Amino acid sequence: MAIFKGEGVAIVTPMYEDGKVNYDKLEELLEFQIANSTDAIIICGTTGESSTMTHGEHLKTIKFAIDKVNKRVPVIAGTGSNCTETAIMMSKEAASYGADALLVVTPYYNKATQKGLIAHYTAIANAVPETPIIMYNVPSRTGCNIQPATVATLVKNVKNIVGLKAASGDLSQIAKTVSLAGADLELYSGNDDQVLPILSLGGLGVISVLSNVAPKETHDMVMKFMEGDTAGAAKIQIDAIPLINALFCEVNPIPVKTALNLMGMNVGPLRMPLCEMEESNKETLKKALQDFGIKLA
């Protein structure tokens, strides 16, 4: 059984002005997502600024989300690290809290070989044998690209490595991955502008930044495709492209947090080294939000 089908939000982590995590606001965001048909919550991923959290904050935020969601939708916890030992520790803790699955990014900076990636993911999976793992491939951010044969080896040989969040942007590579891994692989788009192409390759949904500001529309796009209304799904995908482009005109999550603040959601600042959005880009973002029909505060 798939971890989820449809639209999973890579949710932001709201902050107070002093940079501390705003758990009251996080609860509001979780309720907003669930009320608007979100199919899964992905907590402490790239969009959640996990890379600037302490381990204590990271784990507290994961536990908070799991407890507040309370099984209404799956909660997938980001527990990846470029240190295998740290990833194992984070994964074991998240599993003990009741995470429905783990999202584990490829190791970054230290440039593991494909052999090293197999060892890394196998060690993590063996430490949490009852918890499903989704691998996360985003080479533009990590400098590490997990190859199709490596994905296939892992999903075929490690029982709880089940999925891939594909954010390479390379549809040929993704198609080859599907070809090699076959039915063993649960595939999710990691790029909001490639949802329908990846669904057409057998994908089950999207782990989405766009969903922070447009959860219902993103959910509807995936559902329409799965129900056979490809024209309806394509219209949503095409209509969303200007907004998606605006949400990535600076590095994620700068634009999406800015967008939520423009919408009156008051998610607070970013943590350094991320910084406030350029004013010219903010104006582009405002227009894209309004053109998509999103009301600003």
Predicted features and spans:
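Catalytic cores of TIM-barrel enzymes
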Residues: 2-3, 36, 176-179, 260
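Active-site beta->alpha loop and helix N-cap motifs at the rims of alpha/beta catalytic domains
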Residues: 2-9, 13-145, 153
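Gly/Ser/Thr-rich beta-alpha loop segments that engage phosphate groups in nucleotides
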Residues: 8, 47-50, 80-82, 165, ...
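C-terminal alpha-helical cap/extension of soluble enzyme domains
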Residues: 8-14, 36-38, 200, 207-297
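Short, amphipathic alpha-helical "lid/cap" segments that border enzyme active or binding sites
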Residues: 23, 27-30, 148, 282, ...
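A general structural signal for well-ordered alpha-helical segments in protein cores
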Residues: 26, 58, 62, 87, ...
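Catalytic alpha/beta core domains of metabolic enzymes, predominantly
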Residues: 127-128, 141-248
